[in-house]
Amino acid sequence: MILSDRDIKKYLEEGKLVIHPIDDPQKQIQPSSVDLRLGNSFLHFKVEGRAYIDPTQDSPQELMEIIEIEEGKPFFLRPGEFVLGTTIETVKLPDDLVARVDGRSSLGRLGIIVHATAGYVDPGFCGQITLELSNINRVPVALYPGMRICQISFYKLSSPAETPYYKKAGSKYHNQKGPTASRLNIDFCKKEEK
């Protein structure tokens, strides 16, 4: 069951679901989702001179540099470019909800992809949402910190998760702040230790 605006407001009022800060509830709360805003930090790959990235050998965190954008200034996402962004809002899900993050239609019509594959948010997750931003247009697109960039919708589980994200061993992205690079290399390190 997808939560309606009425249910989203109830979950927020009761503190079961946390989205902070919601700057303008009238604009951000939609009929069955909440619009989230773009933060001002971006992670950009420093891959010049590299033939490929090997997640078993490379630490993606070391391959990225942070770009901070001043308030009111645009970040230009070039054609074919891929960067990690973040939402301003921190989201905390209860154990009986999962969430789905999708791009806003208005940005999709400009060729902006908001997530490559990671649109699913586990029950019990807490943190800012990392966005996998890319531009499939043929011209750069200006993105402004503070603009509504994506929407998050919520799905009720048949029962609360037995092991929500915050209790799961190896939860790599719990309590993440800002754009967070892939931690896939940790999976390979754990296999080698066994």
From Swiss-Prot:
What EC numbers are recorded for this enzyme?
A: 3.5.4.30
Gene3D superfamilies per the UniProt record, alphabetical: 2.70.40.10
Give the range the annotation lists for the signal sequence.
none
GO biological process, alphabetically ordered: dUMP biosynthetic process; dUTP biosynthetic process; nucleobase-containing small molecule interconversion
Q: Name one GO molecular function term.
A: dCTP deaminase activity
Q: Where is this site: Important for bifunctional activity?
A: 119-120
Protein's UniProt name: dCTP deaminase, dUMP-forming
UniProt entry keywords in alphabetical sequence: Hydrolase, Nucleotide metabolism, Nucleotide-binding
Query: Where along the chain is the active site annotated?
Result: 132
Identify the residues that bind dCTP.
Answer: 104-109, 122, 130-132, 151, 165, 172, 176
InterPro entries xref list: dCTP_deaminase, dUTPase-like_sf, dUTPase_trimeric
Family the entry assigns: Belongs to the dCTP deaminase family.
PANTHER family attached to this UniProt entry: DCTP DEAMINASE (PTHR42680:SF3)
Its recorded reaction(s) are: dCTP + 2 H2O = dUMP + NH4(+) + diphosphate
Domain of life assignment: Bacteria
Q: In which pathway does it act?
A: Pyrimidine metabolism; dUMP biosynthesis; dUMP from dCTP: step 1/1
Q: How does it assemble?
A: Homotrimer.
Q: Does the keyword Nucleotide-binding apply?
A: yes
Could you tell me what this protein does?
Answer: Bifunctional enzyme that catalyzes both the deamination of dCTP to dUTP and the hydrolysis of dUTP to dUMP without releasing the toxic dUTP intermediate.
Annotated source species: Dictyoglomus thermophilum (strain ATCC 35947 / DSM 3960 / H-6-12)
